């Protein structure tokens, strides 16, 4: 395979397929398409493929959900409730994400998990947080605050002198390098 072929395949990977795009149409304007007698007439490009339509509807629903949560925060004057969770295994993370999807704030304390389990759980929660447009903030060495899009958290960065000595729960979203 030549370098040119590889380069062409690389470019083709990042270009969009014409079938999956929906052309912009102006209302009440006739569209004229010339048809050659030697070619068969193409199917109309107005119909997106099934997978593209499903993706667009999922994105639309996600944006609608984010707007709904933002509007609720502006008009609600109710008290805010923060759920406190002490996960003991990785499977508890799905319950925490369900609470976040229900527009609740969750304080998560990983003191009953091993460091490896807690990192794995944090990775899962961080991914769900990005999908649901939430916020994940570290508030203590083993505690994280997970909030929906309509809650703003301001955490003052305080370094306690004995916090650095206690390396037992010093896990964070960043990976430690093995030396």
Curated annotation (Swiss-Prot):
The gene is sepF. PANTHER family: CELL DIVISION PROTEIN SEPF. Cell division protein that is part of the divisome complex and is recruited early to the Z-ring. Probably stimulates Z-ring formation, perhaps through the cross-linking of FtsZ protofilaments. Its function overlaps with FtsA. Homodimer. Interacts with FtsZ. This is Cell division protein SepF. The keyword Cell cycle applies. It comes from the Bacteria. Residues 34-57 have a biased composition (Polar residues). GO terms for cellular component: cytoplasm. Keywords: Cell cycle, Cell division, Cytoplasm, Septation. GO terms for biological process: division septum assembly; FtsZ-dependent cytokinesis. InterPro entries: Cell_div_SepF, Cell_div_SepF/SepF-rel, SepF-like_sf. It comes from Streptococcus pneumoniae (strain Hungary19A-6). It holds the Pfam family SepF. Residues 18-57 are annotated as: Disordered.
């Amino acid at each position: 395979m030549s370098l040119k072929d590889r380069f062409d395949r690389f470019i083709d990977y990042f270009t969009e397929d014409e079938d999956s795009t929906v052309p912009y149409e102006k209302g009440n304007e006739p569209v004229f398409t010339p048809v050659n007698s030697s070619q068969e007439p193409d199917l109309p490009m107005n119909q997106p493929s099934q997978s593209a339509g499903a993706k667009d509807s999922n994105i639309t629903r996600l944006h609608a959900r984010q707007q709904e949560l933002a509007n609720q925060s502006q008009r609600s004057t109710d008290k805010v409730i923060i759920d406190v969770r002490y996960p003991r295994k990785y499977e508890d993370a799905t319950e925490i994400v369900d609470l976040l999807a229900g527009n609740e704030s969750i304080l998560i304390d990983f003191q009953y998990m091993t460091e490896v389990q807690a990192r794995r759980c944090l990775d899962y929660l961080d991914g769900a947080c990005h999908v649901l447009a939430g916020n994940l903030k570290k508030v203590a060495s083993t505690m994280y605050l997970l909030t929906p899009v309509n809650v703003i958290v301001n955490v003052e960065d305080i370094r306690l002198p004995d916090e650095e000595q206690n390396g037992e729960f010093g896990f964070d979203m960043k990976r430690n390098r093995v030396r």
